[in-house]
Amino acid sequence: MSDDQPGPRTEYKLETDSELRFEMENGNDKVTVTLLNGHAELYGTELVMKKPYEFGVGAKVAIFTYHGCTIELRGKPDVAYVARETPMVQYLNCNSALEHLRTKAEEDDVRGPVAMVVGPMDVGKSTLCRIFLNYAVRLGRRPIYVDLDVGQGGIAIPGTIGALLVERPAPVAEGFSQQAPLVYHFGHTNPSENDVFYDALITKLAETTLERLQANKRAKHSGMIINTCGWVKQGGYHHILHAAKEFEVNAIFVLDQERLYNELLRDVASKTVQVVYLPKSGGVVKRTRSQRAEARDNRIREYFYGSKMPLYPHSFDVKFSDVKIFKVGSPALPDSCLPLGMKKEDNFTKLVAVQPSMQLLHHILAVSFAESIEENVIQSNVAGFICVTDVNMEKEVLTILSPQPRPLPQTILLVSDLQFMDSH
């Protein structure tokens, strides 16, 4: 929003340990925030004095100050208010404890803390991860961020899990820099769609990231911050326990659910694993099913088209014969029909060939780094994603939307449940 555009201006004077919260729900409205004096931060990233920051539709923002500040808000948010009750000081105390563990790890030349954030949906898990990561980087650390939430896909797109070395704070209105993330294709937005495959991917991602920690001294001492899904009962709880074991987690922060906290105290807490209960922020907003679907769609749109800095994806044709398309998992067979020596679970991680058809239209396909199906395709990380925008059965050609020009870097493609209607 430029200075010559109309828009009501409101000044907010924030006292010590308070935050300005606002939400953007409607149309094409934008809000610009400027720090006029004092110090303030957004989820651990410091605001620069007198620099305007722009937020668009869907933004749910909480700007916090430890020492007091004045903020100018320009535009018409749906809701804007100052909150004096905030758990930020508790979050900072947890970060101080993590930093103490990192300093100790540096002195002893051992691995730094591996911390996992858990809790039900809409309690602020990814926000708390962002706060911990930003604070760590501001102190000169280089932690690895792991995202196991296939529902929102904070590192790549929904339907994936991944890891990223964080080297600088996230820009105020965007996420962390996406250079060279390690991403694995799951293909669904809920782990319950294929629990066996999801666990196998967690094991593979843990093995790879723990190896990477050992190989990079600065990252090794900095440790990891792990974000998880909001499914915390039954199968979801099993996945939390599995992730804690595979990543060799030594700190678990439980947001806003005492039942989960007590279960983890019973099943995980020990001399080597601390379990800490934290309240959620009052600024956390419950999302409807349609808001979640819209957020997923926006993540995929950003992947192809960018957000603040527009990207220009490529559209080109690929012959059916030039690619091999698979999905992971086949329908479960009764025990009596299984081949000798095969377990029922094996079906869930089986590679099943998919014949090109109109059913692929609008589907997201992951481009695997695997060069042949002799490799372990399901546990190979992915180079990126494409979207099928047209299927010509007569010419035997797929038209695809791709972030890179032709040719595709590899020819093994994995089908995702996710679809994207390209409206550009």
From Swiss-Prot:
Name of one Pfam family that matches: CLP1_P
Keyword rRNA-binding: no
Domain of life: Eukaryota
Compartment(s) of residence: Nucleus
GO cellular component: mRNA cleavage factor complex
Keywords: ATP-binding, mRNA processing, Nucleotide-binding, Nucleus
Main location: nucleus
Binding site for ATP: 19, 60, 122-127
InterPro entries, alphabetized: Clp1, Clp1/Grc3, Clp1_C, Clp1_C_sf, Clp1_N, Clp1_N_sf, CLP1_P, P-loop_NTPase
Molecular-function annotations in GO: ATP binding; polynucleotide 5'-hydroxyl-kinase activity
Swiss-Prot/TrEMBL GO biological process terms: mRNA 3'-end processing; tRNA splicing, via endonucleolytic cleavage and ligation
HAMAP family according to UniProt: Clp1
Purpose: Required for endonucleolytic cleavage during polyadenylation-dependent pre-mRNA 3'-end formation.
UniProt xrefs under PANTHER family: CLEAVAGE/POLYADENYLATION FACTOR IA SUBUNIT CLP1P, POLYRIBONUCLEOTIDE 5'-HYDROXYL-KINASE CLP1
Family the entry assigns: Belongs to the Clp1 family. Clp1 subfamily.
Name recorded for this polypeptide: Protein CLP1 homolog
Species for this entry: Aedes aegypti
